[in-house]
């Protein structure tokens, strides 16, 4: 640095300064705002370090407080409308709410973007429900500080999260100079903030410290994985030269810029320039003329060079730094910003951070633009899921991530974060306290707590186990199942009352239909648990209906397009859900819509009827009569019953393709060979038919020698012994056969036969039981004993069925079955001790001394058995089944509530009538019973006889009572009713309410319910039909009292298998036992690679999961589709028309292009790559060449010499991003430097050759990107001018060598010095470069005691290996040995007197020698 240059002020002062806030609100006036006062722009790095040091000092975790985005707002010189500013503010709100955002603006009140930023902070920050890292940084000069002596600038409101960054200005600087300097400083602030200083330079306290001790904290070192850098983005709406300077700074530093093209005329010109640059007949000179003419009316005619540089910088690579949007796209500003960050920063190795930003801003469009699978590791996926799951408005991004099927693994931290961002009242009050009995909120999900959650979920789902596996939370990698993780996340979200997330995760589960039904059952149970909080109950019931409806819709969608696939799902066992099939799980979860579906009803009927089919003969007998007669007489089974033909038998044949792939399997014993096909069944059949005939009649052509050389078909065996087994090697053809009668085991094991046989015996049982009851007197003890035994067998059968079903279905789902067994048992006990074997002592204790009580119990038993028979057997009828359900619904919903209401009226009326009508009657149990009896019977009759005055009462009339408390009713007989007016009114009131109000209300309720429950009754009836089929599947083949024979035969079958089929449980005709262990494909043309693991039903589950994803996607997009088809078609036509106009223009101008516009190619040295031949006109970077896209080439590192390979920049796909990031970091470090030698970078982040375009991108044959230095050494010897000589090589050139290392010691110079006789110590001393390696000008002199080499020049040189991103640079160093002893004769080198150097060496080298002599005083 020259001594005459002023030393920049590097001071930094944190302070609180007063500012003048202008506005109409209450914030107008003087405000005190925290500020950082910079002495000069060169003090900016210190300010950045101060900011991040303060953040690190107050942080409780790594990178806390570091923003995700830094948005610079540029609108200097513009004026926006209130509506436009409101649109921009709404676009910025998504950033402030979704992620950590720092806004940078000028802060001036006449800057519209500054007002937008201030308004956004005031409207968003007070309403946030989570901690937000939001900061508004105002960068300006010290004119913003309020002062009495100068006119201070008015600033925007600084009351919320605002920091001033003030730079002192020079007193003599003009306004334009200060404005340009502040514009560059504002842009440099964003660039430097986007590159935080290394953690080694930031002090972080080990414990909480006061603000006064922040600066004394110790330093820490973080690993590169913890290096978080915010993404800088600029939003431009400027209309001045200063705004263009700031915009150019951003583009030159590779920061994406979003220009609001309709905000001002300058932005419109920029948009037009961008469009013109894409035209086919672009001409640079015409463009400059057009641009100047457009800028002149705006007073910006001298700014065309800035726009030209802007366009060159933004188009110097394959990255688009500038994006134009209009006001209609401001609502999607977050998506635009994320897309720009993806294109600009993903190439620098920051894809993970871009993906996390997209998750925070709910912008799933980036997922289709990058290889997410390569970036989604467990840590990043956990962070993304936490961002998405904790917010209901980010379901779109969550569904987009789940569509990629990432390897999800649930962690305790993830679930705890979800809990803290959810409705903690529901979770703590209902789930933890009420359901689990916890009195505290857990801080982690340990196995014990996870086990308690599993028990709760099992209880809520009525027995479905392993839905919340505690083993998932261990560190064992074997439990990392993504489908299990999705199930756990869905259940946890349900427990946190997050309905939207539950529906999304259910749609992406492995078995969406089954899992949705289970979640629906859990939601319904949670709704029941939260009955006291009606809003929770309503929300959970709605969620339950939505999940059940989603499962039904998905199932119906598949059934309408592919009924076979839907039916196959019903026959497929599900290992994660108790091994149930779909229908069983639907019954378990009370999913009536699924069971009522047509496909499920087909499955239920197949389960009920099996393969049994009744003949049409005789016609006059209905089917049920044929089944009953056949079941009783057995012989008609052979004549009236048939076995329904099975589906076409799928033989376990293997296709030739699979046989080709299955190398480990032996070929068939017989083969068919044909010259026309591999398998010729026709030739094989002809051979089988003609061979015996030709042998018998002597027409064997083979014996006569007339056979063809290539026979059309022949069959030969590999094993002669197996010829007689099957002469046709390719299987037998199916033949049409008559249906045969079923076997007795098939007939009696069919549920429909069990049903009709059981109903027949049940009717006989009821008749016999009724006969035993109506026998006079004590009846027949023998008959009663027989009927009790028969009843006991019925009870045993019911217990057996209930026990069998209770193995998988909890008893709480079968309350009627449990009640039936219990009531039956009570009646059996009472009849046993009262009638069959009377236990006299017990009866005497109970006060029962007559057989009448036994007859009463028997009568009620007959009633109960009759009604239970009605409800048990009636669901099979399609007429009476729905009717009984309707009656049941009316009774439960209307009549029960009516009874509660009328009971209140009856009891209150009974009290009032007793008090007013019979005031003197004593209150006894007999009186109470008679009063209630009259009140109850008044529902059906109107008996007023006991309320009228009888003759007896008239005779006992006393008149007015003499004493107040005696004979209040004026009758001597207390049982006489009072005839007063109040008594009349009380009675009339009761009958009016009872007869005129309550009965019509009940009828109205019945009428309304009967109309509304048709669909529900039909579903319930179909639901009961499945239960009926399941019950009779489990019943023994013969009903009571023949059940004992079934038990005896079952015991015999344990020793003999002769009748095993007769007593086997009939499960389902379409569900075979081998289906439980085989894979889902049933075709012999699919080869399964044995080395690849497959899960059972993997492909079927994948099919349903994809359909569920599509259904979820379509459901979410229905509300977003606003444009109709005609508008879309019109836009499509306009797009095609514009494209045709562009192509026509390009076609018409294709023949008029100049030769200079055409691209020619030439071979790049030492390679087979062709590079573009660039003419001299297009070579400078200042000239716009829109279609310039050179090939990218980097010489492989292996092709370099071994000593150079360690310096080569590896430009692989994995490493090129890191190279770009390093170059951007170098550029950011030089933002405040005044050195004009700073390299320019392309939009992609590679350095640009100062010589201009070369026609080749990459580093080419150079080992490094950027400058590849070749050092030239001017070694002088001699202390005076007459003896001065210089060292040259054999080619009479100054010694030179490529210098690729960056150390301060020059090893090649050391070897040269040693070669000419300098000692080792002196050679090392002369080779050590200065710390300040600036170029020494000719007017300076080096002292004689200075031994460091002098840096004479550093110049860019032309080289055939140069590319756009790598070039040659000559670095010249000089050293004077003066009077040191040297060797005069050196191999490869020689000493040349400086007086004879002209004409001997190259002129530019001679100039360097004389320059070296000058600075050394020679």
UniProtKB/Swiss-Prot annotation:
It is found in: Membrane. The keyword Nucleus does not apply. One of its GO terms (cellular component) is plasma membrane. GO terms for biological process: apoptotic process; metal ion transport; monoatomic cation transmembrane transport. It is a multi-pass membrane protein. Its main location: membrane. It holds the Pfam family TRPM2. Keywords: Apoptosis, Membrane, Transmembrane, Transmembrane helix. InterPro entries: TRPM. The chain crosses the membrane at residues 617-637, 755-775, 782-802, 818-838, 856-876, 898-918, 986-1006. GO terms for molecular function: monoatomic cation channel activity. Plays a major role in programmed cell death. This is Protein ced-11. It comes from Caenorhabditis elegans.
């Amino acid at each position: 640095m020259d001594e005459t240059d002023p030393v920049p002020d590097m001071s930094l002062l944190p302070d609180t300064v007063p500012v003048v806030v202008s506005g109409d609100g209450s914030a107008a006036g003087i405000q005190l705002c925290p500020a950082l006062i910079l002495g000069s722009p060169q003090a900016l790095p210190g300010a950045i370090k101060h900011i991040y040091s303060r953040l690190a000092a107050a942080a409780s975790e790594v990178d806390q407080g570091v923003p995700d985005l830094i948005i610079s707002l540029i609108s200097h010189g513009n004026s926006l409308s209130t509506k436009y500013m409101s649109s921009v503010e709404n676009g910025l709100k998504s950033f402030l709410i979704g992620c950590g955002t720092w806004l940078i603006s000028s802060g001036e009140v006449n800057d519209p973007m500054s007002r937008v930023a201030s308004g956004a902070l005031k409207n968003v920050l007070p309403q946030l429900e989570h901690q937000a890292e939001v900061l508004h940084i105002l960068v300006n000069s010290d004119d913003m500080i309020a002062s009495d002596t100068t006119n201070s600038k008015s600033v925007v409101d600084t009351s919320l999260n605002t920091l001033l960054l003030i730079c002192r200005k020079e007193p003599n600087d003009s306004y334009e100079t200060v404005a340009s300097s502040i514009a560059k400083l504002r842009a440099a602030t964003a660039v430097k903030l986007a590159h935080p200083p290394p953690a080694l330079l930031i002090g972080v306290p080990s414990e909480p410290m006061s603000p006064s001790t922040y600066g004394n904290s110790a330093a820490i070192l973080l690993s590169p994985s913890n290096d978080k850098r915010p993404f800088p983005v600029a939003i431009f709406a400027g209309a001045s030269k200063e705004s263009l300077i700031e915009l150019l700074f951003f583009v030159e530093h590779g920061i994406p810029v979003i220009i609001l093209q309709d905000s001002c005329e300058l932005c419109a010109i920029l948009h037009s320039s961008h469009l013109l640059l894409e035209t086919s007949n672009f001409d640079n000179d015409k463009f400059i003329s057009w641009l100047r003419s457009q800028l002149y009316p705006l007073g910006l005619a001298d700014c065309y060079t800035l726009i030209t540089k802007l366009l060159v910088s933004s188009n110097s690579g394959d990255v688009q730094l500038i994006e134009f949007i209009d006001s209609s796209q401001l609502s999607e500003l977050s998506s635009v910003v994320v897309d720009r960050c993806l294109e600009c920063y993903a190439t620098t190795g920051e894809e993970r951070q871009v993906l996390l930003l997209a998750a925070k801003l709910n912008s799933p469009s980036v997922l289709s633009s990058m290889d997410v699978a390569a970036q989604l590791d467990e840590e990043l996926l956990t962070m993304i899921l936490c961002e998405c799951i904790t917010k209901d408005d980010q379901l779109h991004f969550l569904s987009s991530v789940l569509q990629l099927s990432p390897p999800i693994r649930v962690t305790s931290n993830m679930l705890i974060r979800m809990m803290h961002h959810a409705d903690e009242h529901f979770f703590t009050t209902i789930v933890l306290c009420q359901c689990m009995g916890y009195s505290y909120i857990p801080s982690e999900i340990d196995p014990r707590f996870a086990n308690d959650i599993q028990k709760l979920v099992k209880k809520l789902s009525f027995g479905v186990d392993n839905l919340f596996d505690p083993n998932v939370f261990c560190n064992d990698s074997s439990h990392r199942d993504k489908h299990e993780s999705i199930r756990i996340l869905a259940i946890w979200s349900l427990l946190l009352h997050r309905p939207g997330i539950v529906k999304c995760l259910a749609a992406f589960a492995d078995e969406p239909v089954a899992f949705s039904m289970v979640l629906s059952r859990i939601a319904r149970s949670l709704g029941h648990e939260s009955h006291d909080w009606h809003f929770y109950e309503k929300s959970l019931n709605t969620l339950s209906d939505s999940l059940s409806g989603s499962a039904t819709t998905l199932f119906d969608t598949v059934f309408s397009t592919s009924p076979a696939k839907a039916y196959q799902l019903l026959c497929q066992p599900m290992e994660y859900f108790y091994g149930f099939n779909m229908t069983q799980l639907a019954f378990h979860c009370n999913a009536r819509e699924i069971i009522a579906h047509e496909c499920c009803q087909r499955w239920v009927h197949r389960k009920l009827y099996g393969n049994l089919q009744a003949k049409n003969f005789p016609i006059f007998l209905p089917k049920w009569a044929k089944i009953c007669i056949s079941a009783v007489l057995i012989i008609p089974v052979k004549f009236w019953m048939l076995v329904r033909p099975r589906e076409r038998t799928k033989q376990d044949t293997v296709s030739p393709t699979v046989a080709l792939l299955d190398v480990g399997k032996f070929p068939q014993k017989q083969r068919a060979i044909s010259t026309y096909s591999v398998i010729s069944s026709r030739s094989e059949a002809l051979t089988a038919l003609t061979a015996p005939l030709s042998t018998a009649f002597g027409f064997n052509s083979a014996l006569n020698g007339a056979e063809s050389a290539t026979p059309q078909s022949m069959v030969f065996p590999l094993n002669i012994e197996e010829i007689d087994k099957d002469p046709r090697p390719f299987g037998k053809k199916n033949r049409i056969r008559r249906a045969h009668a079923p076997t007795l085991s098939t007939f009696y094991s069919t549920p429909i036969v069990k049903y009709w046989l059981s109903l027949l015996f049940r009717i006989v049982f009821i008749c016999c039981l009724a006969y035993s009851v109506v026998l006079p007197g004590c009846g027949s003890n023998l008959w009663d004993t027989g009927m009790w035994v028969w009843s006991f067998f019925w009870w045993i059968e019911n217990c057996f069925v209930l026990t069998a079903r209770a193995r998988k279905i909890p008893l709480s789902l079968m309350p009627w079955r449990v009640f039936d067994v219990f009531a039956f048992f009570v009646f059996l006990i009472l009849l046993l001790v009262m009638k069959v074997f009377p236990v006299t002592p017990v009866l005497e204790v109970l006060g029962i001394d007559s057989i009448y009580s036994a007859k009463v119990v028997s009568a009620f038993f007959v009633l109960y058995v009759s009604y239970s028979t009605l409800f048990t057997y009636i669901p099979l009828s399609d007429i009476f089944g729905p009717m009984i359900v309707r009656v049941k619904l009316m009774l439960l919903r209307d009549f029960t509530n009516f009874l509660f209401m009328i009971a209140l009226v009856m009891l209150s009326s009974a009290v009032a009538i007793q008090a007013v009508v019979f005031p003197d009657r004593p209150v006894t149990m007999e009186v109470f019973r008679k009063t209630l009896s009259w009140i109850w019977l008044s529902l059906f009759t109107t008996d007023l006889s006991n309320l009228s005055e009888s003759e007896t009462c008239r005779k006992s009339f006393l008149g007015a009572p003499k004493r107040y408390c005696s004979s209040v009713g004026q009758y001597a007989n207390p049982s006489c009713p009072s005839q007063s007016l109040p008594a009349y009114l009380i009675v009339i009131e009761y009958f009016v309410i009872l007869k005129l109000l309550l009965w019509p209300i009940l009828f109205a309720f019945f009428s309304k319910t009967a109309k509304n429950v048709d669909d529900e009754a039909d579903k319930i009836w179909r639901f009961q039909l499945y239960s009926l089929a399941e019950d009779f599947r489990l019943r023994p083949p013969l009903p009571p009292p023949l059940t004992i024979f079934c038990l005896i035969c079952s015991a015999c079958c344990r020793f003999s298998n002769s009748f095993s089929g007769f007593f086997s449980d009939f499960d389902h005709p379409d569900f075979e036992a081998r289906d439980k262990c085989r894979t889902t494909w049933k075709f012999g043309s699919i080869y399964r690679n044995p080395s690849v693991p497959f899960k059972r039903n993997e492909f079927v589950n994948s099919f349903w999961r994809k359909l569920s994803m599509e259904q979820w996607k379509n459901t979410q997009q229905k509300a977003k589709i606003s444009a109709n088809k005609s508008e879309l078609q019109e836009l499509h036509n306009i797009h095609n028309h514009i494209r045709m106009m562009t192509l026509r223009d390009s076609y018409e101008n294709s023949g008029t292009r100049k030769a200079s516009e055409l691209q020619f190619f030439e071979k790049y040295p030492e390679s087979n790559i062709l590079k573009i031949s660039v003419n001299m006109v297009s070579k400078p970077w200042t000239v716009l060449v829109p279609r310039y896209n050179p090939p990218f080439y980097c010489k492989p590192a292996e092709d370099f010499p071994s000593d150079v390979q360690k310096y080569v920049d590896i430009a692989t796909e994995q490493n090129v991003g890191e190279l770009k990031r390093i170059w951007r970091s170098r550029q950011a470090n030089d933002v405040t430097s005044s050195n004009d030698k700073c390299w320019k970078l392309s939009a992609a982040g590679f350095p640009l050759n100062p010589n201009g375009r070369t026609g080749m991108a990459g580093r080419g044959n150079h080992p490094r990107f950027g400058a590849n230095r070749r050092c030239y050494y001017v070694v002088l010897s001699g202390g005076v001018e007459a003896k001065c000589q210089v060292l040259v090589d054999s080619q009479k050139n100054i010694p030179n060598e490529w210098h690729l290392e960056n150390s301060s010691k020059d090893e090649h110079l050391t070897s040269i010095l040693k070669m000419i006789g300098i000692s080792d110590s002196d050679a090392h001393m002369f080779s050590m470069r200065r710390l300040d390696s600036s170029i020494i000008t000719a007017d300076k002199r080096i002292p004689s005691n200075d031994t460091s080499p002098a840096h004479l020049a550093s110049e860019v040189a032309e080289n055939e290996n140069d590319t756009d991103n790598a070039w040659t640079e000559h670095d010249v160093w000089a050293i004077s040995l003066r009077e040191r002893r040297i060797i005069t004769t050196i191999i490869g080198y020689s000493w040349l007197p400086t007086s004879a150097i002209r004409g001997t060496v190259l002129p530019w080298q001679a100039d360097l020698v004389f320059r070296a002599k000058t600075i050394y005083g020679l």
